[in-house]
């Protein structure tokens, strides 16, 4: 018995000794890491390095600098970008922009006010405006369309007017890493010299073609769903420039919208398996023979104008990529380098600005960004808090894009017709869907409700006037299609984040209320 007691007490003493040693060692490592980064920050070094000075990088630089952070931004090309994406700012995005103090960046760029959609299908037209009487939305319920490059340059000027923001033109080659902690970047400056920059926090915000994403997440590979083809018709103005014109054409959707007082963006989706060549003229033939006849007469002249005048045709892959946090400390990824959804909902900038707003608020209490463990806690919190907005937009974009593809399958076409009927029926259906689309009501559960309502109404149309065996079969196929659209997004975004309303309520209270942050 005495021997047993001795063994037991020896074991207890060993466990206690090991625990004390482990905790002391962990504390020492955390202290050493903080001291190392603090040492790196001497002599005016940066608190934060931002890779990329697009919409996200510039907006984040401004927000963090206003909080007193020293920010070093490294951008590959400071010329005004010529992009086809990022030309439409939803009402929710404008709210986020104003909360960051950047609302004036939409001024003096000839941005056009947009009050909603005009939707066309099979010769019919209907309006789907943003809800005006929405007591839950604390900002003017309208969108803006513009030249992306002009907007980016405004953001850059605003950010780099602050004395604690340093802008440098250069190409980031890799992240500097030490024992699983990112300490900075290696980059080539404008003169072609390879150099390094150190900071306790590095933000990767270099867009959908990010060359740093793979070094942080092996499984973060973007999936190309289709291609968006577009061009600008110049020196013209739409009859209804305040609307984004969405045409449910075949093989997929077509969009026409005003991006300045004299320029109109024309674009359409092409599926990968049937992509016409631009070089040999197949694309122009495809546009004239397939797309143009489906464009409504009041839009057709402007749509043709760009083709006939030889407007530069741009092709952009429509990518999808779920967000995944990096296991490495001292780094966070934002924007299209972090999370992408189909661009048909034109909400990428809105999600990005929401992310910046959240990250800024979470970082504000931290006086020392060199504590990698505390910063990691902030990043983990950020990932959860962003879900109401990101999950709503991601699910809506990815589901909506599948519905808009034309098909000879009766079930798929019934779903497509059901979306048109539901979106354009007026009342709470239209206002509810447009509030979701515009980022005015980022509640995933509300989106699930509307998707289920569209499915049930589409099934009702299929079964009408009498539920024959063939109609029942098509209805079952339609239900299966709806589940294929919804379930993968539930899995990707998280069931709890999608179906529990408390998260959305907390997000709305913290980030969409009328009070400024």
From Swiss-Prot:
Pathway: Terpene metabolism; lanosterol biosynthesis; lanosterol from farnesyl diphosphate: step 2/3
Coiled-coil regions listed in the entry: none
Pfam families in UniProt: DAO, SE
Required co-factors: FAD
Enzyme Commission number(s) of this protein: 1.14.14.17
Residues engaged in binding FAD: 55-56, 75-76, 83, 88, 156, 172, 336, 349
Entries under InterPro entries matching the protein: FAD-dep_OxRdtase (IPR006076), FAD/NAD-bd_sf (IPR036188), Squalene_epoxidase (IPR013698), Squalene_monox (IPR040125)
Membrane topology: Multi-pass membrane protein
Chain segments annotated as transmembrane: 3-23, 45-65, 447-467
One BP term from GO: sterol biosynthetic process
Gene3D superfamilies: FAD/NAD(P)-binding domain (3.50.50.60)
Tissue distribution: Expressed in seedlings, leaves, stems, inflorescences and siliques.
Single annotated GO MF: squalene monooxygenase activity
Compartment(s): Membrane
Keywords for the protein's UniProt record, in alphabetical order: FAD, Flavoprotein, Membrane, Oxidoreductase, Transmembrane, Transmembrane helix
A cellular component term, taken from the record's GO annotations: membrane
PANTHER family, A to Z: SQUALENE EPOXIDASE 5-RELATED (PTHR10835:SF22), SQUALENE MONOOXYGENASE (PTHR10835)
Family: Belongs to the squalene monooxygenase family.
Role played: Catalyzes the stereospecific oxidation of squalene to (S)-2,3-epoxysqualene, and is considered to be a rate-limiting enzyme in steroid biosynthesis.
Protein name: Squalene epoxidase 6
Organism name: Arabidopsis thaliana (Mouse-ear cress)
Gene, per the UniProt record: SQE6
């Amino acid at each position: 018995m005495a021997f047993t007691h001795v063994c037991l007490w020896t074991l207890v003493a060993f466990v206690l000794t090991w625990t004390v040693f482990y905790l002391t060692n962990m504390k020492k490592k955390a202290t050493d890491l903080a001291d190392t980064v603090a040492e790196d920050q001497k002599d005016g070094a940066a608190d934060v390095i931002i890779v990329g000075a697009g919409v996200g990088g510039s907006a984040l630089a401004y927000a963090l600098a206003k909080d007193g952070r020293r920010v070093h931004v490294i951008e590959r090309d400071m010329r005004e970008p010529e992009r086809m994406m990022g030309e439409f700012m939803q009402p929710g995005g404008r709210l986020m922009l104003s909360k960051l103090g950047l609302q004036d960046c939409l001024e003096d760029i000839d941005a056009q006010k947009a009050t909603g959609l005009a939707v066309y299908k099979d010769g019919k037209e209907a309006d789907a405006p943003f809800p005006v009487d929405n007591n839950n939305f604390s900002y003017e319920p309208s969108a803006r369309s513009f030249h992306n490059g002009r907007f980016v340059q405004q953001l850059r000027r605003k950010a780099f007017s602050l004395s604690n923001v340093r802008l440098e033109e250069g190409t980031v080659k890799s992240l500097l890493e030490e024992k699983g902690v990112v300490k900075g970047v290696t980059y080539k400056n404008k003169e072609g010299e390879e150099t390094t920059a150190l900071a306790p926090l590095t933000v990767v915000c270099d867009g959908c073609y990010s060359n740093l994403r793979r070094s942080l997440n092996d499984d973060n590979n973007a999936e190309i769903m289709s291609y968006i083809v577009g061009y600008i018709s110049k020196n013209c103005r739409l009859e209804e420039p305040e609307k984004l014109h969405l045409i449910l054409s075949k093989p997929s959707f077509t969009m026409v919208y005003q991006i300045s007082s004299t320029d109109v963006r024309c674009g359409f989706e092409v599926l990968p398996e049937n992509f016409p060549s631009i070089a040999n003229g197949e694309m122009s033939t495809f546009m004239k023979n397939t797309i143009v006849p489906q464009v409504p007469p009041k839009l057709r002249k402007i749509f043709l104008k760009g083709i006939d005048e030889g407007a530069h045709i741009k092709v952009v892959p429509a990518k999808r990529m779920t967000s995944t946090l990096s296991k490495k400390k001292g780094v966070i990824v934002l924007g299209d380098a972090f999370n992408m959804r189909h661009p048909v909902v034109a909400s990428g900038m809105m999600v990005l600005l929401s992310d910046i707003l959240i990250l800024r608020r979470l970082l504000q209490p931290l006086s020392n960004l060199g504590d990698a463990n505390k910063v990691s806690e902030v990043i983990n919190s950020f990932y959860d808090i962003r879900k109401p907005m990101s999950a709503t937009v991601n699910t809506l974009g990815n589901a909506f894009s599948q519905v808009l593809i034309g098909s000879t399958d009766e079930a798929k076409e019934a779903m497509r017709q059901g979306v048109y009927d539901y979106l354009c029926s007026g009342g709470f259906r239209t206002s509810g869907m447009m509030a979701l689309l515009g980022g005015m009501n980022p509640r995933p559960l509300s989106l699930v409700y509307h998707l289920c309502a569209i499915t049930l109404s589409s099934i009702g149309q299929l079964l009408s006037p009498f539920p024959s065996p063939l109609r029942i079969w098509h209805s079952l196929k339609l239900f299966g299609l709806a589940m294929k659209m919804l379930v993968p997004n539930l899995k990707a975004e998280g069931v709890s984040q999608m179906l529990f309303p408390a998260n959305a309520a907390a997000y709305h209270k913290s980030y969409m209320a009328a009070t400024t942050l």
